């Protein structure tokens, strides 16, 4: 059964052009905690969508449930796999970096998904997670408009505290949290600043490290 992401993949992809400064702001925030990816490091974006973030951030692999989105992602030279986050088709300890951007709100089973992230990460591997904070003004706006948004209609937005609890349970230790998007999206004409912490910005990025006591 095709989802809205399959039926409207091009529309979804065009959002990043129509909101280029919002996209730029999110990229800057992610880069602040992601850092440079070395050629020998294996990296993957879970919920890669149409590959916008992966392409610019030099993420080699991408995974998504939408076959139509992955067709666009492949054009951006990302190695693609169709699967769900709760059942990753990769060997344990196979990636140095995992990126997830606005994916947490679509997870059917967050506990299982983050356990899978832990499994595929190498010891000291890094998860970088970008999210819309449910408790922010942006998060409240998205929730209010959910019924009319074909992409977020069935999303469950989460707070930073909720995500932190999921990470803790999966033995993923938080290292850094930053935030951006302090104004309504329609008012953003230049890249927004990035601040440490959360509670002000609508878009929050958390970095977490796989704990060393991996068995």
Where are each of the predicted segments found?
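Conserved class I S-adenosyl-L-methionine
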Residues: 1-38, 52-53, 69, 126-154, 181, ...
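Short catalytic micro-motifs in class I SAM-dependent methyltransferases
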Residues: 102-105
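Class I SAM-dependent methyltransferase SAM/SAH-binding core
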Residues: 44-87
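A conserved beta-strand element that flanks and buttresses the S-adenosyl-L-methionine
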Residues: 99
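Core SAM-dependent methyltransferase catalytic element
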Residues: 190-215
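A short glycine-rich, Lys/Arg-flanked "PGG" loop and its adjoining helix->strand segment in the class I
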Residues: 111-123
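Short alpha-helix
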Residues: 155-177
